[in-house]
Amino acid sequence: WIGPNKEALAASKGVKTPPDLKESFNGGPLNIPLGVLDKQAYEFCYQPTLFPEIKGFKEAWISYYREMEILAKEIMTVFAVALGLETHYFNKFINHPISALRALNYPPTQNVKKLEQHRAGAHTDYGSLTILLPEPGSVGLQIFKNGKWLNVPPTKDCFIINIGDLMELWTSKRWVSTLHRVVAKVNQPRRLSLAFFHQPDWDAEIKPIFNKPLMKSVKSGPYLMKKFLSTSH
């Protein structure tokens, strides 16, 4: 669990802001793969999730996480086909993904006291893709496109799929990691959402697939850890 005013997501982009007005319950991979020798990987990705003592919560969480793993792998297959690659091109990078599930609570905003304080500061997601399930009727999510912030209202019975930093790197910015935020305006209602952040294997080397690479290769796990730690407030 990460409480309000403990994380500033804009810091992952090198932007200094007040901490975010949100809280989250977080869980990582359900199983530890055999042969994990990297101490950083073990400590950062594979610590047991401390579930609250609420009847059915743990079972529902684990079930949802597993379904998201399946869906994310299917989406990665669709991505490969869309990019003109072999159907299962990305499979070798996601044998033991270090994906995270976050249940996000953005409390009501009666007062916004600090300038540029948002419920989630402007940031991009760090992995390959994100599967977001917002509560129906929720407000506040915005993406930055063509120099403007645009609202992203939820659509009934639909996920929002977001491109992450590693997919941008793979595609040499052919597909762009979406800059987004959750704004805080006076008298906004509570916002709830579930976000599944699909992340390739800890030691997967991510490098541009196509010609004229614009970005240097990175290791999936260390990149994720560096970004995550940069947001701690």
State the predicted function of each range.
Residues 1-233:
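Peripheral, non-catalytic segments flanking oxidoreductase cores
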